[in-house]
């Protein structure tokens, strides 16, 4: 599987991902704007979360007035009792705008800097959709853009415009879809081991013992998470070359 162009050797659903979420960190290398692929995550999170995080895509929306701190619960800061911090976002973007102006020789405002990074993030999202649609012969203008995630509604219209799409589907619970999916997903523990040996009757006890050991490790992990022994099912798979 690949994540943001990086090949990962891990079990994964066939989903094309792009590093352009709300936590994607903003970079200026002296010549160009870049968004991601590294992320501030949820902790420390973007600068507006009041945990000392860097400027991220979410902060662009705060700077541009598309996220109003007054409409969010006071769950930010070290004690999770403060609202989003627009002041620190404005200060950081002002400093970044000065850096960009000094490097480019063209004076830009904090809002213009935020808008520039926003355009990069939207382009990254649109290009990811193009890769699995237009590049495979599909006309995306005939499809509906389905959005989810806490930041889905913030970027849906601009991504749709970039792709020439006319219709957007935004479910009322789109913001908690990932959490809902995790809540419904089976709890699993995966274990694997590579064994280089000839497949023969003599090797069977060793191979069976390895499977038993992996099963015990996986079962122990699930028991530690509070899963009842009666609810645990063990599946064994062997890939032979």
What residue spans do the PLM features occupy?
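N-terminally biased helix-coil "hinge/interface" segments that flank
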Residues: 1-241
